[in-house]
Design a protein with these regions (language model features):
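Alpha-solenoid helical repeat scaffolds
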Residues: 1-280
Length: 280
């Protein structure tokens, strides 16, 4: 048995060398012989799928994906290979056979959402697939964020806000959902609501520089320049490399005609941290 395993290992190494040399047909012959010896080995089947994808033979890769081990793990791994190669029709053909299976993993719907968005350009279908992913699934957090982004892009702001608040409730330690709320209010020029949200976020994460910057920006938008400057100064004191706060304080001092030497130093420091930023 050990001798057989060693021969199989050597054969697989040879096949990989042939693939590296783009001799895909020769490599595939070796994989086929290995499958005859071990027909349920998912690793060999995946190598065959991968080899055909690299050879640009999508249909043959799909045939291997469909005829390989009848396990969810194998099918999803093969689907991932198709998605990575942007072979969306092949990925969809493989996943379509799983989406009506009540026992199939919820990841199937996440992958189908990717196809709906990237290949079909169908936002509503994408949302439908994402909505079917339950909270206990490991992809739920990502699915929720994508739903918010899609609704935002469609200017469905109230729907997006409902999901943002849902995210805050389900993930209270995730600051991103707080930042999303603030930015969505700012996008709609709802500055008072933005300030309320930013103040709440500041109370939860008092030392978070990004939240502090957004809080200061909201104050600035409301015309409360002195308070905004104080917030930005506190960020610079805490983090002298925060280019956004450096930039704000530098320009504020320059506009006021105060401490111009320091203003120049702050702006130079901001430029050093973000040399390609358009507003420095």
């Amino acid at each position: 048995v050990m001798e057989v395993m060693q021969r199989a290992g050597l054969a697989e190494k040879l096949a990989r060398l042939l693939e590296a040399d783009r001799q895909f047909s020769e490599a595939n012959e070796i994989y086929n012989s290995l499958i005859e010896q071990d027909p349920d080995n998912p690793d060999i089947w995946i190598r065959m799928v991968e080899g055909q994808i690299r050879a640009g033979k999508g249909q043959k890769a799909l045939d291997y994906a469909l005829n390989g081990p009848a396990t969810y793990g194998y099918k999803l791994t093969a689907a991932t290979l198709f998605l990575d190669a942007r072979m969306y029709p092949e990925a969809e053909a493989l996943l379509d056979g799983l989406k009506s299976d009540p026992n199939a993993p919820d990841e199937v719907h996440f992958y189908l959402a990717a196809i709906a968005y990237e290949y079909h350009k169908d936002v509503q279908e994408t949302l439908n697939f994402l909505e079917s992913i339950p909270p206990e699934n490991r992809f739920y957090d990502r699915a929720l964020r994508l739903r918010i982004q899609l609704l935002h892009d469609q200017q469905r702001y109230e729907d997006a806000m409902q999901l943002i608040l849902q995210g805050q409730s389900q993930f209270p330690t995730e600051r991103d959902f707080r930042l999303m709320e603030i930015h969505l209010y700012l996008l709609q020029d709802r500055y008072k609501e933005a300030l309320t949200a930013a103040t709440a976020a500041q109370q939860i994460w008092p030392s978070d520089d990004e939240i502090a910057y957004v809080y200061g920006s909201v104050l600035d938008s409301l015309g409360r320049k002195r308070e905004a400057l104080a917030v930005m100064e506190s960020i610079v004191a805490r983090n002298p490399e925060d280019y956004q706060a450096l930039n704000y304080v530098g320009y504020s001092l320059a506009e006021q005609g105060k401490d111009l030497e320091r203003a120049v130093l702050l702006l130079e420091a901001a430029l050093k941290q973000a040399p390609d930023h358009a507003y420095i």
